[in-house]
């Protein structure tokens, strides 16, 4: 029986990032997620101590959904793929980004944008994951009209 009290996660920092094993919505000492090496986790920063170690949480004040249902806001990300992007664009992506709304017209997908320069994308087709990622990256350089042409061509909707 595994009795891990915490996980060390790589969030792209030079310091440790620690996630308590019961810091998931609805988790207890007896019922908690079992993360494995290589698992992708959507979490948020809870605090940073004086040694610059980052403490993470997968609990959400806004949602009462638990990790065990798979419906919680934060937690283990199943399937999909992680891509990297320039973290300087984090706020642009998170703050009313039109490209993400527009992409919904071309395919169904799930998306998690990290402030650490990581983006997780999950769609039914692997090639759509790549198209979504390319579209998001291209949106930093193109205006709305150029993006519309690009999306139609990329998703063969001309």
Language model regions located:
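Single-stranded RNA-binding regions, centering on S1/OB-family and related RNA-binding modules
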Residues: 2-44, 48-158
């Amino acid at each position: 029986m595994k009795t891990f009290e915490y996980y060390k996660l790589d969030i792209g920092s030079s310091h440790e990032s620690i996630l308590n094993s019961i810091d998931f919505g609805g988790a207890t000492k007896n019922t908690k997620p079992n993360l494995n090496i290589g698992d992708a986790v959507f979490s948020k920063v809870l605090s940073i101590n004086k040694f610059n170690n980052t403490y993470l949480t997968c609990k959400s004040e806004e949602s009462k959904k638990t990790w065990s249902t798979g419906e919680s806001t934060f937690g283990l990300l199943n399937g999909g793929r992680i891509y990297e992007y320039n973290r300087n664009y984090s706020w642009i992506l998170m703050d009313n980004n039109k490209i993400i709304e527009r992409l919904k017209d071309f395919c169904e997908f799930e998306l998690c944008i990290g402030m650490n320069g990581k983006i997780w994308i999950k769609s039914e087709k692997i090639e759509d994951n790549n198209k979504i990622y390319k579209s998001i990256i291209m949106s930093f350089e193109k205006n709305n009209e150029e993006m519309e042409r690009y999306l139609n061509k990329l998703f063969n909707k001309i």
